């Protein structure tokens, strides 16, 4: 038998069911692929509109967001805000993040000291800031991480601080309680289930069967323009000056 062609062909009067099925897929496969391409473009278009209206709602635009992982920089990017914080494209372990939030100014007086991580699977830069570890997961080199850190550290607005935490990365209930008790004007923690006893907890739906929230910056589904962290009204939160 002849090989299946890679482009659409029209076969007149196919003489078997097998031939009819083959012709059908040859005719419509490109359309199926195109559908995915169109879907991505439509999602991008509608997400851009969603972000546009959020930017109109936003009144407080000189925010410094101290975040424990990449949710922070993704939210800032959606809102078109400058990264006025060095906590971008990195993550911090829960207990370390709580120490950092409690004594932010003190920790920021120290220089980064890059170390070789004990975990062999970690191939990105890791640094100590005094006694806490910073995992620069989305940086290719220590130099790149250091330059970005120092540049953004100089933009911090200590009069407009917001602290964003999640229940990921081994976070315990005690970590959540400790974070909730910090004397911070603006703090929130994204959680996989409701915590009525934790005032700063924000319930993110969709992770109830998990032990923590997943990647909150991802879209909820193939067809949705909403990301998981959109359950949190971060615009209203930032506007609470």
Predicted segments with their positions:
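Short, hydrophobic beta-strand segments that form beta-sheet elements in well-ordered domains
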Residues: 164, 185-192
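Short, conserved loop/helix-junction motifs that constitute active-site signature segments
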Residues: 178-184
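A short secondary-structure junction signal
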Residues: 172-178
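Membrane-proximal basic amphipathic "stem/tether" segments
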Residues: 6-60
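Polybasic, proline/glycine-rich intrinsically disordered low-complexity segments
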Residues: 192-240
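Positively charged, amphipathic N-terminal segments that serve as targeting/anchoring signals
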Residues: 48-167, 171-172, 197-208
């Amino acid at each position: 038998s002849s090989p299946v062609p890679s482009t659409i062909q029209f076969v007149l009067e196919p003489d078997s069911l097998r031939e009819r099925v083959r012709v059908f897929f040859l005719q419509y496969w490109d359309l199926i692929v195109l559908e995915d391409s169109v879907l991505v473009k439509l999602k991008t278009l509608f997400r851009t509109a969603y972000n546009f209206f959020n930017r109109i709602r936003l009144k407080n635009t000189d925010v410094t967001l101290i975040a424990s992982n990449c949710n922070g920089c993704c939210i800032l990017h959606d809102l078109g805000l400058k990264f006025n914080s060095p906590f971008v494209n990195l993550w911090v372990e829960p207990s370390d993040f709580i120490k950092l939030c409690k004594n932010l100014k003190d920790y920021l007086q120290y220089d980064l000291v890059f170390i070789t991580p004990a975990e062999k699977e970690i191939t990105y830069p890791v640094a100590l800031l005094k006694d806490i570890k910073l995992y620069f997961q989305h940086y290719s080199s220590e130099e790149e991480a250091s330059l970005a850190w120092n540049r953004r550290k100089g933009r911090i607005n200590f009069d407009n601080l917001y602290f964003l935490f999640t229940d990921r990365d081994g976070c315990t209930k005690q970590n959540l309680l400790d974070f909730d008790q910090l004397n911070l004007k603006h703090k929130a923690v994204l959680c996989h289930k409701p915590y009525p006893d934790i005032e700063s907890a924000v319930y993110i739906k969709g992770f109830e069967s998990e032990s923590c929230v997943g990647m909150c910056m991802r879209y909820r589904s193939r067809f949705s323009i909403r990301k998981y962290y959109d359950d949190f009204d971060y615009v209203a939160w930032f506007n609470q000056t």
